[in-house]
Amino acid sequence: MAETQAPTGYLFSEKHEWVKVEGDMALIGISDFAQSALGDIVFVDLPKTGKNIKQFETFGTIESVKAAEDLYAPIGGEVIESNSALSKNPGDVNSKPFDSWMIKVKGFSTSELDKLLTPEKYKALVAGLE
């Protein structure tokens, strides 16, 4: 298997979601490893704007031709936007997992970021799973 992508500027959960902080808001999506393991993604169910989510709790589901899986929030906060483009083109998560954010959140605690993995630590975690 090819080396998993884990770009600089992103933090990762052990459940294979990523977070990218941009000012006072953060983008959340799934990792390259997760999309590869799932296979062709056919549906993404995301929360509505205004929903409060908690770190490491489910915020939605993702379905592929292989399986349906829960999505876990790498950080908590208020959902300020869900990526509606994914309802029309869920396969974008496969082709560009780091450009295909799922939700934007604000009001997160920066201390929650300390519980996440750096790209290097995430690559080491994934290497142990392959």
From Swiss-Prot:
The modification N6-lipoyllysine is found at residue 66. Binds 1 lipoyl cofactor covalently. Its cofactor is (R)-lipoate. Gene3D superfamilies: 2.40.50.100. Keywords: Lipoyl. GO terms for cellular component: cytosol; glycine cleavage complex. It comes from the Bacteria. HAMAP family: GcvH. Pfam families: GCV_H. The glycine cleavage system is composed of four proteins: P, T, L and H. NCBIfam families: gcvH, PRK01202.1. Belongs to the GcvH family. One of its GO terms (biological process) is glycine decarboxylation via glycine cleavage system. The glycine cleavage system catalyzes the degradation of glycine. The H protein shuttles the methylamine group of glycine from the P protein to the T protein. The gene is gcvH. Residues 25-106 form the Lipoyl-binding domain. This is Glycine cleavage system H protein. SUPFAM superfamilies: Single hybrid motif (SSF51230).
